[in-house]
Amino acid sequence: MQAQIVNKIFEIFSKNNPNPKTELIYKNDFTLLVAVILSAQATDISVNLATKSLFATYDTPEKILELGEEGLKKYIKSIGLFNSKAKNIIALCKILISNYQASVPNDFKALIKLPGVGRKTANVVLNCLFGMPTMAVDTHVFRVANRIGLAKGDTPEIVENELLQIIDTKWLTHAHHWLILHGRYICKARKPDCDICPIKEYCDYYFNLK
């Protein structure tokens, strides 16, 4: 996709939503990290429902560790893969306390070494908490990028690298939020709402429908 078209797409996103935010609800750096881990193969809505009562009392690594793995499972059992997620979060809490003074590191390599943290989670944390121009590629971003012709790739990492190359630096702080929200509410998986899409005139998928 030509640079001027990419720029136009993000100009439209920016005009329609100047300051996009994650839809995950969190209280501090640690609770965002936990929420993003829980959001893997789950919806933000389901995560927010589960963490509302959890974070009301247990919002630090020390408190989650005190709650314990079985106690944590009781709060997050409505979320997919809750057994493995609980195990990872408890292990993560121990590492944060012992290695990072119970703080969330602001380094990609340090983050992806934490249990339950992959590229997407690390990039979300770096972007949302520390304002870094990262590109977190979830299922929505992967689908939208390929569908509209923004970035073609067979894996999230390939799409991530393509997007980082073609998106102007000035858009990168908000770019992954715009793409996620576009995929969640307009460019849906089964049936995209092309009629209300603000960027359809620049979209490969829409062009091929004609």
Curated annotation (Swiss-Prot):
| Ranges where the HhH domain occurs | 108-127
Q: Which GO terms describe its molecular function?
A: 4 iron, 4 sulfur cluster binding; class I DNA-(apurinic or apyrimidinic site) endonuclease activity; DNA binding; DNA N-glycosylase activity; metal ion binding
GO terms under biological process: base-excision repair, AP site formation
Question: Bound how, and how many: what does the cofactor note say?
Answer: Binds 1 [4Fe-4S] cluster.
Q: Which InterPro entries match?
A: DNA_glycosylase (IPR011257), Endonuclease-III-like_CS2 (IPR004036), Endonuclease3_FeS-loop_motif (IPR003651), HhH-GPD_domain (IPR003265), HhH_base_excis_C (IPR023170), HhH_motif (IPR000445), Nth (IPR005759)
What EC class is this?
Answer: lyase
Quick one: which residues bind [4Fe-4S] cluster? C187, C194, C197, C203
Reaction it catalyzes: 2'-deoxyribonucleotide-(2'-deoxyribose 5'-phosphate)-2'-deoxyribonucleotide-DNA = a 3'-end 2'-deoxyribonucleotide-(2,3-dehydro-2,3-deoxyribose 5'-phosphate)-DNA + a 5'-end 5'-phospho-2'-deoxyribonucleoside-DNA + H(+)
List cofactor names only: [4Fe-4S] cluster
Entry's SMART domains? ENDO3c, FES
A Pfam short name: EndIII_4Fe-2S
EC numbers, comma separated:
4.2.99.18
- Swiss-Prot/TrEMBL keywords: 4Fe-4S, DNA damage, DNA repair, DNA-binding, Glycosidase, Hydrolase, Iron, Iron-sulfur, Lyase, Metal-binding
Q: Does the keyword DNA repair apply?
A: yes
Q: Which HAMAP family match?
A: Nth
Functionally, this protein is described as follows: DNA repair enzyme that has both DNA N-glycosylase activity and AP-lyase activity. The DNA N-glycosylase activity releases various damaged pyrimidines from DNA by cleaving the N-glycosidic bond, leaving an AP (apurinic/apyrimidinic) site. The AP-lyase activity cleaves the phosphodiester bond 3' to the AP site by a beta-elimination, leaving a 3'-terminal unsaturated sugar and a product with a terminal 5'-phosphate.
The record's comment on protein family reads:
Belongs to the Nth/MutY family.
Protein name (Swiss-Prot/TrEMBL)? Endonuclease III
Organism per entry:
Rickettsia conorii (strain ATCC VR-613 / Malish 7)
